């Protein structure tokens, strides 16, 4: 073992020298006067954030209630937001699936292709796209609106006449469309299910120009499915295209169009008889259907919009939208009525019919929103106006075979 103390002595000397070297700096720091820095104010708008970018079940802001980007705590109404992540995780591929899982909303499918939505005891007929829309002509929805085009769905329960023009004590359903992204993204989702269900959806988004000032997005899909009901089949085709262009640093122009076709073979029209002629309850197989093999119900929806957004001074923003929605429906349906005999099953009669429906809606919406100072406080203000027009052509025809006797449902093959 070495008894030489030289290494320890050198370490002590080095540490002492380092401490002495830092003392003048410490003394200078303690002796200097505190310096006040100039105040720096940082302001920024929350901006629109797509729910698909968050991969969350929670949306940061909602615009359905006030056209202002408010957090859920700031909205003075009951609001539920169904995000893209939730729709994907639970395979909520149509609006029926979405609203069935929404608090305070009841979905009633009276037949295979006709649905009623209710909230707080009233029918829901206020539907919007990006906050623009008008009340539906009928309280029921024909066909199934697919959710492949939407980033999220916002549901405001209770009256919302301030933003819709016609208040309803039920609810307002706002479909927030997907928008183009600056980065290139692409996805394909393939789904299979019971009764030969097949579904595929492709989604491509990204910059169109080298500078990124023009961006585009295309969503296309196809679905085909059967049912536990005899002879029933539904086929859907969807397409959505949207373009965004930065006209200036503060001006954004958006153009978009969507089309969806939903073609159903052998849809139900009416329901199975509940009672036999002797008053006892019927008991049919789960797959029993009164539909004929020639009946059909085809629905087509066209959805087009042009939107111009201008950022103004002082945190203000102005938005103008022209929106067109057209729903076309063609159907040949077969209804059976009467009370069958319990022993023979006979007693039902035919009621064939044909329907053509065409609904065209136009909406022009313009508003501005921003902050202002009053009484030493900052307030938010929305100013705007909306114009809308709806035209409906509804035709119904009834067949010659009304009242003709039919075979028992246990033998009915369409």
Placement of each model-derived feature along the sequence:
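Residue-level detector of the transmembrane beta-barrel scaffold of outer-membrane proteins
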Residues: 118, 128, 185-189, 215-217, ...
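Acidic/polar loop-and-plug regions of large Gram-negative outer-membrane beta-barrel proteins
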Residues: 223-227, 240-311, 324-359, 402-414
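N-terminal Sec signal peptide and the immediately downstream disordered periplasmic leader
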Residues: 1-90, 96-104
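Outer-membrane beta-barrel channels and translocator barrels
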Residues: 209-211, 246-250, 313-315, 369, ...
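Outer-membrane beta-barrel translocator/receptor signature
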Residues: 136, 148-151, 162-241, 247-251, ...
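Transmembrane beta-barrel strands of outer-membrane/channel proteins
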Residues: 188-192, 218-224, 255-259, 320-324, ...
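Non-catalytic regulatory/gating segments with a bias toward low-complexity or hydrophobic composition
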Residues: 79, 87, 98-99, 153-158, ...
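Short acidic/polar hinge/loop motifs at secondary-structure boundaries
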Residues: 107, 116, 132-157, 175-177
